[in-house]
Design a protein with these regions (language model features):
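Short hydrophobic/aromatic beta-strand or adjacent loop that forms the aromatic wall/cage
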Residues: 44, 139-143
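Conserved glycine-rich acetyl-CoA-binding loop
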Residues: 76-87, 107-115, 119-120
């Protein structure tokens, strides 16, 4: 058996979204229409992780001045628990270059994502009470921040 070929690919054109459709089916995150609009803006930075020529994960940021807000990080359901989210997040943090800090929000119940972010140096910096809708009501959003040096690594 051969090892899978994994590569980081920048997203820069609306045509780049078509292969990402399986990542966004049945999701409560941003729609492909929203992401296409975001990709059209100069402050968007986005990448996907490609495994054996198929996109298996994607990450999106809005960058203003020296700050980046992570809009979405998503891994194909069948590819989760293999370290691909960590690999994509780390590669994107390096590729952000001159960004001084990355901010994100995550559902309070998403313990796997929170653990991933903490393991890479993000710290919890705030709370948005009852921010997300759930089948049973509302759920808090945890705000997290990572300060980077200008080489893209955590400080």
């Amino acid at each position: 058996m051969t090892d899978a070929q994994i590569a980081l690919r920048a997203l820069s054109d609306p045509a780049d979204l078509e292969p990402l459709q399986p990542l966004y089916e049945h999701s409560d995150g941003p729609s492909c229409g929203f992401l296409q609009g975001l990709l059209d803006q100069s402050h968007c930075r986005a990448w996907c992780l490609v495994k054996d020529n198929q996109p298996v994960a994607a990450i999106w940021y809005q960058c203003v001045a020296e700050r980046a807000a992570m809009v979405d990080l998503r891994v194909l359901a069948s590819e989760r628990r293999q370290g691909l989210g960590r690999q994509l997040l780390w590669a994107s943090l390096t590729a952000l270059g001159d960004v001084g800090a990355v901010e994100l929000e995550v559902r309070s119940s998403n313990m796997a994502a929170r653990a991933l972010y903490k393991s890479l140096g993000f710290s919890e910096t705030g709370l948005r009470p009852k921010y997300y809708a759930t089948p049973d009501g509302r759920e808090d959003a945890i705000l997290m921040t990572l300060t980077l040096n200008h080489g893209g690594s955590a400080t």
